[in-house]
Amino acid sequence: MANGYTYEDYQDTAKWLLSHTEQRPQVAVICGSGLGGLVNKLTQAQTFDYSEIPNFPESTVPGHAGRLVFGILNGRACVMMQGRFHMYEGYPFWKVTFPVRVFRLLGVETLVVTNAAGGLNPNFEVGDIMLIRDHINLPGFSGENPLRGPNEERFGVRFPAMSDAYDRDMRQKAHSTWKQMGEQRELQEGTYVMLGGPNFETVAECRLLRNLGADAVGMSTVPEVIVARHCGLRVFGFSLITNKVIMDYESQGKANHEEVLEAGKQAAQKLEQFVSLLMASIPVSGHTG
């Protein structure tokens, strides 16, 4: 099925939010598994449960609280999704990405995406942060794309380019900010590949993905980025490496969601501090920063 939402549905949700808060966000942040603690850094926070927002889907995954939080972070007016939606929850991509178009109508200019991911690159360690340089949309190979169906010209063009999906200037600023933090581990950078889930990958799949050039694997992020770029948002994002994928048939290890959440808890503070510092570097209308 193509998009089940009309332009008016996006408008209605945006109008509802604008009538229930005086805040006007410039930056939207999607918090991945176990990374929702970033909202605790917001000042003047105002929270809405997804269930009370017209047309909003609801998050069903542990580690995803299901709240939309408005507030100020390091001088930037933000709206944060404390919990995202996934294909494996049964949602089509047009529902997964519904909030992104709403953010555009709220006046958001930049989308920051975060996720928990498995490390395919052998140089990555658990707890590393990978700046996303590019992505591979594996579901797209079989026609699963959030832009499938009639194009909504009021958001963007029929055939948007994705070669520059992740903003180069913000990636450079991210490296500078990381150096200022003085972390021992370097900030990684690489390609994120999305699978549908909910099962974790087989050994053969992991080997294939690595051969395709992917550095980290997860079950989210890509559809939101595609829709964000379609409607003209600046995008950058990070993967928190919460486990190293199994590449060896002799290995006794197994990936599990509890491990992902625990690793997220341990490293989340570092990522939250990083995103908070980086927020001041995000250009907004009327500012040069």
From Swiss-Prot:
The record marks N243 as: Important for substrate specificity. A purine D-ribonucleoside binds at Y88, E201, M219, N243, H257. Phosphate binds at S33, H64, R84, F85, H86, A116, S220. GO terms for cellular component: cytoplasm. Its EC number is 2.4.2.1. Its main location: cytoplasm. The modification N-acetylmethionine is found at M1. Pathway: Purine metabolism; purine nucleoside salvage. Pfam families: PNP_UDP_1. One of its GO terms (biological process) is purine ribonucleoside salvage. GO terms for molecular function: guanosine phosphorylase activity; purine-nucleoside phosphorylase activity. Catalyzes the phosphorolytic breakdown of the N-glycosidic bond in the beta-(deoxy)ribonucleoside molecules, with the formation of the corresponding free purine bases and pentose-1-phosphate. Preferentially acts on 6-oxopurine nucleosides including inosine and guanosine. Homotrimer. Belongs to the PNP/MTAP phosphorylase family. This is Purine nucleoside phosphorylase. It comes from Bos taurus.
